[in-house]
Amino acid sequence: MQIKSPYYRVSVKAKINFNGKILLVKEDGKKWDLPGGGIEHYETIDEALKRELTEEIGVSDFILTSGPKNFKMIDAAANRPLIFIAYELELDSATEFHPSGNVEIGLFDPGKIQDTVSYSPEYSDYIRE
């Protein structure tokens, strides 16, 4: 496969275990994934994580429980290399989600999401852990 660009798009992701389920999002009908997105040039990683979670699921108050864990892979659809920086988060059990209009939220049993996330095996395994 010929890569279009040697530059990596760096994204920050949040693995959220909410009441024993893993929270995944689906944007614009695409595939299920951890919430998060690209880090803007002017942002710190923490700022980007807070912005992305506010934009996607309407949550800005959280506690980091572990991280970061890094993943490097190829986005086959866009034919570009990606780097994800993933953090595990904890939310209050009474948290209410307010997703943006193009985002669907799903809560999945960790043992049953193996066919839901279609990135690299290492990344998929991390989500299921």
What residue spans do the PLM features occupy?
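Unchanged
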Residues: 39-63, 71-122
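Active-site beta-strand termini and strand-to-loop segments that position acidic
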Residues: 16-19, 89-91
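Short loop/edge segments at beta-strand edges and connector loops
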Residues: 66
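A short gly/proline-enriched turn/hairpin at secondary-structure junctions
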Residues: 33-37
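Acidic, metal-coordinating catalytic segment for phosphate/diphosphate chemistry
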Residues: 1-13, 19
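C-terminal lobe/hinge of AMP-binding adenylation domains
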Residues: 26-29
